[in-house]
């Protein structure tokens, strides 16, 4: 999962947010970082992958909840909610893979947020696919 995340979001190699920052600011929907969400969110996902043994940390719960919230966002011009609108198709698929990774690899119960996030990101992927298909036919 780590490599898929790095391939889809190359900016994570720049490490614009430290692991310490992420641990001290676990809720990126409340304590919005000074970097764009397209940079911040993948770093939070990477933190979860690299720190899977620290599952008691709030970063896991808040990252899953944030992804659920971002999938439901309706307005691309709202900077603190624009994550899904900034994602390309590969990144959307990678977010879905991350959520599936959470479902299979994490032992704590993140329901109902996790199931909702998976369902909502599946819809994002479907909407993007149908948008692309309709614009090709135009």
Annotate each predicted stretch with a short phrase:
Residues 1-90, 132, 137:
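Alpha-helical solenoid scaffolds in large eukaryotic transport, assembly, and signaling factors
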Residues 72-137:
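Helix-rich interaction surfaces within compact, conserved domain-sized segments
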């Amino acid at each position: 999962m780590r490599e898929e995340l790095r391939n889809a979001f190359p900016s994570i190699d720049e490490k614009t947010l430290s692991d310490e920052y992420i641990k001290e600011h676990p809720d990126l929907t409340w304590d919005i970082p000074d970097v764009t969400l397209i940079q911040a969110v993948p770093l939070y996902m990477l933190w979860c992958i690299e720190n899977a043994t620290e599952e008691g940390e709030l970063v896991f719960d808040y990252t899953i909840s944030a992804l659920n919230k971002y999938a439901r966002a309706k307005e691309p011009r709202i900077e603190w909610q624009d994550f899904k609108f900034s994602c390309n198709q590969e990144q959307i698929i990678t977010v879905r893979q991350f959520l599936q990774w959470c479902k299979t690899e994490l032992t704590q119960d993140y329901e109902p947020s996790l199931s909702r996030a998976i369902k909502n990101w599946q819809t994002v992927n479907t909407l993007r696919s149908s948008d692309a298909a309709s614009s090709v036919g135009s």
